[in-house]
Amino acid sequence: PTDDPEINALRDRQVRNVLATLFFSQGIPMLLAGDELGRTQQGNNNSYCQDNEISWVDWDAAAKHSDLIEFVAALSALRRAHPVFRRRRFFSGQTGDSVDGQRDIIWLTPSGHEMNAGDWNSGYAKALAVCVNGDAITEPGPRGERITDSDFIILVNAHSEAVRFSVPASIGSPGTAWQVIVDTGSPQPVAGALDPAPASSAETGGAGLGSAGLGGSALNLEVAPRAIVVLRGAKPAG
């Protein structure tokens, strides 16, 4: 335990990073009771025999960690609202029968180049971007209907310094407007995640929350140290 505000702020951010990684991953998200309250078991990952404060859920912590509870609720709502995060089939990395002719998933380096084997095996790489295509969901809905969703870009920066990402204009449907809906490095990490937030320039520092850029030109965002930024693409009408 520590009273150092910088250390505690970093720990809180890392908690948000792990939760965001969980909720925006495919498969069933698994939470241990109390994760949404900041319950850590004091680092004990095998506490089955600890019938004491290590393993008990301290419900009084709910008031102290209300912001974390709200963050988890917002992530859960976003996941529930967007089937691209709940696919029942594996990604193929191919176009398949996507409406827009783009692949279902693309992995990029911060400079905007598609990742290759060397990038994946690099020992010093601490940042990447993943783009998931909402028009490339291959499984049908419960009535056999086609499932479509928004496109998403997830920027991950595990570095101790800020990293600038460049996403090529070819990502997403032509004319797509990108909105930052989650920024774990922000004091309000999900402001605007469910309701649009005021526009915020991506060229003047951190990612911010709100409108980040339009399709047709490269998207440039600076992601804070040890932070995750999620962008949702709004396709043009028609």
Give each language-model segment a name.
Residues T2, I7-R16, T21-G238:
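Carbohydrate-interacting/catalytic domains
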